[in-house]
Regions:
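S-adenosylmethionine
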Residues: 1-124
Length: 124
């Protein structure tokens, strides 16, 4: 059973034992993303508007990034970074499955991002 989680805009809490959402075809199709409420909160609290330029510095495995990307509605850009190359690969997979096209996935030190994108982002 899924219950509406009233703290966030489009999120539900799964409290059942018989269904395994991570094995559902809709999950593999990118129609929903599984994560803890604590991971949902940052992206839901940041006032993202379509067209914004957004940086997610610690983006893997992709929960915040997929929510931020969805809030951009295909406009603007999201730079999703994780300093771990292996985690960034998993992040890229999740972004691709979710179908968000305006995302640049990086595996870079934050200082390097600051150097190349000085005063570029609207939201971090």
């Amino acid at each position: 059973r899924f219950n509406r989680y009233h703290g966030l805009r489009m999120d539900f809490i799964y409290d059942g034992e018989h269904v395994q959402p991570a094995k559902h075809p809709y999950y593999f199709a990118g129609l929903f993303y599984l994560q803890e409420p604590s991971a949902m909160t940052p992206a839901n609290r940041l006032p993202i508007e379509p067209g914004d330029k957004v940086l997610d510095v610690c983006a893997a495995p992709g929960g915040k990034a997929t929510e931020l990307g969805a809030k951009l509605c295909g406009e603007g850009v999201l730079v999703a970074n994780d300093i771990s190359n292996s985690r960034a690969k998993g992040l890229l997979k999740n972004i691709e499955v979710f179908g968000i096209g305006n995302v640049l996935v990086l595996s870079e030190e934050p200082g390097k991002i600051e150097e190349y994108f000085t005063e570029y982002f609207d939201k971090i």
